Design a protein with these regions (language model features):
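Short, flexible helix/strand-to-coil boundary loops that buttress conserved ligand/catalytic motifs
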Residues: 79, 88-91
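Short S/T/G/P-rich N-terminal loop/turn motif that feeds into the first structured element of a domain
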Residues: 1-62, 70-80, 96, 103-105
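Short glycine/proline-enriched turn or capping motifs at secondary-structure junctions
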Residues: 91-98
Length: 105
C-alpha cells in the first residue's frame, strides 16, 4: 500500500499495553513528558503519542503508544536509545502484558 500522493511510506509502530490499573491523568502526563523528549531528540519521529485506548474492543489493553518514523532505520535507532530504555523501565512495573505491531505504509 502506497501513501497518498506517492510520498515515501513511514514506519509505524504501535504498542498496546495491559496495565495493572487503568491509566490515570498523572500517568498520561508523565508519558507526555517522555513523548515530548522523544520528539525533541529524534527528528525522524513524525508522530509519537501515548493515550488511553478508546476502542470498545480494548479489553485489558488500556494504554496505546502510536508512533511513526521516517524509516525502519530511524525506528531501530529510537529502540536502541537510552531514552527508550528509560521509558521502558518506567513502564515495566505498571505493565502486565504488551502487544506490538509494526508496518510500513
Amino acid at each position: 500500500v502506497s501513501p497518498p500522493g506517492g510520498s515515501r511510506p513511514l514506519f509505524h509502530h504501535c504498542c498496546l499495553f495491559a496495565l495493572a490499573a487503568p491509566p490515570d491523568a498523572a500517568l498520561l502526563a508523565e508519558l507526555e513528558r517522555f513523548s515530548a523528549a522523544f520528539r525533541a531528540a529524534f527528528p525522524a519521529i513524525r508522530r509519537y503519542r501515548f493515550g488511553a485506548n478508546l476502542s470498545r474492543k480494548a479489553g485489558r489493553f488500556g494504554l496505546v503508544l502510536y508512533s511513526a518514523f521516517d524509516d525502519e532505520a530511524s525506528f531501530r535507532a529510537y529502540v536502541a536509545s537510552a531514552l527508550h530504555d528509560e521509558v521502558a523501565a518506567f513502564l515495566a512495573p505498571l505493565v502486565t502484558e504488551t502487544m506490538i505491531g509494526d508496518i510500513e505504509a
